[in-house]
Amino acid sequence: MAPVRAPTARHRLVARRRLREGGFQTPNGASIQFPLPAYPWQSPLLGPEGNLLIENGDNKNETSGDVDPAKATKADLFPYGVAAKITGVEGRGTGEFTLLVEGVTRIHVEKVIADKAYLEGKVSSYADPALITDSALEELFMSLKLLSRQFVTILRLSSLLPQSSGTPGLSPLLARRLDFYIAKQKYPGALADFMANIVESTYEEKLQILTLIDVKERVAKVIELLDRQVTNIKNSMKITTITATSLPFPMDPDSTKPGKVKPPVKAPGQGVGMPFPPQGGFMGRGGNPDDEQEPNEIEELQKRLDAARLSPEAAKIADREIKRLKKIHPAQAEYAVTRTYLETLAEIPWTATTDDRLGPDTLNRARKQLDDDHYGLDKVKKRLLEYLAVLRLKQAINDDVDIQIKQIEQELGVGSENGKEDAAQPAAVDLTVDEKVKAGGAKLEALKNRRMVDKSPILLLVGPPGVGKTSLARSVATALGRKFHRISLGGVRDEAEIRGHRRTYVAAMPGLVVQGLKKVGVANPVFLLDEIDKVGGSSIHGDPSAAMLEVLDPEQNHNFTDHYVNIPIDLSKVLFIATANSLDTIPAPLLDRMETIYIPGYTTLEKRHIAMQHLVPKQLRVNGLDESQVSFTPEVVSKIIESYTREAGVRNLEREISSVARGKAVEFADAKDSGHPENYNPQLTVDDLEKFLGIEKFEEEIAEKTSRPGIVTGLVAYSSGGNGSILFIEVADMPGNGSVQLTGKLGDVLKESVEVALTWVKAHAYELGLTQSPNENIMKDRSIHVHCPSGAVPKDGPSSGISQAIALISLFSGKAVPSTMAMTGEISLRGRITAVGGIKEKLIGALRAGVKTVLLPAQNRKDVKDLPQEVKDGLEIIHVSHIWEAIRYVWPDGQWPSEHDYPSVESRL
């Protein structure tokens, strides 16, 4: 196949005619004459698939002369050529055509008989004999096969060289096909013609081979060319063994083109070389003496490893890998793998640490830092300050020990010198010196054992979203002066993401822990393991939570081994702080390794303080406003908290404040653009919120002004955390058969609380004055209906037991409960009132709803100490341990028996 430049109409006519006529057959060994059109092509030889074997087909053949086929004359024809059969014509969009031709036989032009639309002459064809009858030719043929296969093998190995070296090569697939073709070839002439187009030779030598009609002479000439090139290759480099790490020679592709044969380059101590020696040499050695790129890279890597102060085991492995790297050529894949591994070792902070700011003012500074960044969270702050205090004391002890060790080392050094100077003195003096040295060494060893080892605690902060777990860990790092790194564990399903991938895998890399150490560059950072409760469980990819066991075990993490690094790494200096929203999904062994600190949701009072001190100023800055242009009052913020958000954290609160700020920004911009800035009112009121935030999303329950029998005010803490409120318990009776109907989307536990309360009331109806006889059933011919308003909101929990019992007594007795009194507590069949949770949130909600008196279980007395002072001042808190006590506080004017008058029967096993 060859492209034709600027074909004329007569050329296309001839091509079509010859295409219709088809080819011709030439008998073997015959020489016949026939007329044939001749074209002096200006294209190099192409293969059967239309691809160049070695050369670039777009480059011009400079020695063939700039002959235009449209203007060619008989003087431009070479006497010998190839008869070809046209197998197809392909058109191009540029107006050019491509002829697909297939070579048939070697020809000799005897005479040009026509020079019109095209050159036509009489030619003689020469076909190679089909059988080998000469033993000398057979021997030459075997030598040609052997040398050809050797040459193809070298070309295949050349593909391992970098592309920038300019060395041509064959892909393994093409090389195998060529080797198969050579092995199966039966005709010496055909193989000689084929190899003549592959071997490096001049254009004149190629023409010479074309003129050789005798097969023996042609094979001998090609063997000469092959032997010359293989000899040049062997003289230019030493190919000792073909192994997985051996590399081939370079070969200049331009040298195969006619007229561009370059003289070989000789290097000192070498034979004839090739034009472009490969960079970096072979087997990791040699190469161009002036090219120091790879040696410099390895030298720089060695300097980085030395500066990293590796552990003894890491240094040993690094030295071994450096030696391997020097023997590997940069073009091999193993070179990049080894270099990346060594770079990882150099980037890991084996001994580099940041000095903790543990001065005399450490605790005060840390306390101020935590208070400035977070409001409330006293338990968490207390634990972190305890850690800082312990760290401060340990450092003070270690500093004293280091001073004593230094003094003893100086004394031992002086004693040794005196011993050397007095070597000629009697042996008694030498014994005294030896005894001092031994005593000093023992004392030195004892002092080293007194050094305090810093084992950082592993804290787990558990709480709902948005309460400040992540920012709290960042504040700890700031207070300590350490670097901070966050590792997100949510959605991690592969153990290799924690421990790393083994180096045998393609694109292997270290795990998240080692990558974090590389990023911070120190061995004692603060690591935040975010969302540890969302780590995937056991699967075909391993168990990531099990991989975390070694990381978070203070007794083991000083010897943590990453699969990629495969060298023990000390993680004992890392302060790990994990966060979770729930403990339910954390495996028990992993949970046992961490110190759990619960962070409850913020109360309404805490949210108001956070909003006024932090969120409002932040959102004003974000929206281009200042405090003089928008004024948020505590009443406005409280309204946003109570009516537009219901969450444990403050994220939605910040969004709502941002919405209000943007609305005020629009008003301010409109007033300013209209030229009437005086019309803008920076003051925000509660009534303005509906304009910016829409209608209220949540309606706050308010204590009723009037009281009625069968209605009791209970207390509830929302599952979202941080918020609490009051909950009305409504009970009504009607004629019936003793059935109980429950509504209000009540959970199973809450339904059981109603049954327990009803059973206690029925059992003590006579003592309560509800029946005339102990044997009378108060539910005879009567049914009751228990309802909790806000029927669309799910409700559950045992804390309304006391409220249910008081509501039933109120209904049956006709006595109303004071509307300003609320109560919470679980009731048992014996009438005991037991502890419940969410006391802080419930009482804050009760104060906000207008409640004055609250009945709490006596077991919750400890929770009252954590209440804000304004809640303690605004509520009368009464602690009860039995339902009879609660009844006396609710209806103090009634005559009620005491608890001791009616002791319950308890079974003891």
UniProtKB/Swiss-Prot annotation:
Disruption phenotype: Increases pexophagy. Sensitive to hydrogen peroxide, and histidine starvation (induced by amitrole). Abnormal sexual development; decreases the number of perithecia produced and enhances the growth of aerial mycelium, the amount of mature spores formed is decreased. GO terms for molecular function: ATP binding; ATP hydrolysis activity; ATP-dependent peptidase activity; serine-type endopeptidase activity. Residues 706-893 form the Lon proteolytic domain. Residues 1-230 form the Lon N-terminal domain. It comes from the Eukaryota. A motif (Microbody targeting signal) lies at residues 907-909. Keywords: ATP-binding, Cytoplasm, Hydrolase, Nucleotide-binding, Peroxisome, Protease, Serine protease. One of its GO terms (biological process) is protein import into peroxisome matrix. Its EC number is 3.4.21.53. ATP binds at G463, P464, P465, G466, V467, G468, K469, T470. ATP-dependent serine protease that mediates the selective degradation of misfolded and unassembled polypeptides in the peroxisomal matrix. Necessary for type 2 peroxisome targeting signal (PTS2)-containing protein processing and facilitates peroxisome matrix protein import. PROSITE patterns: LON_N, LON_PROTEOLYTIC. Residues 249-269 are annotated as: Disordered. This is Lon protease homolog 2, peroxisomal. It is an enzyme of class 3 (hydrolase).
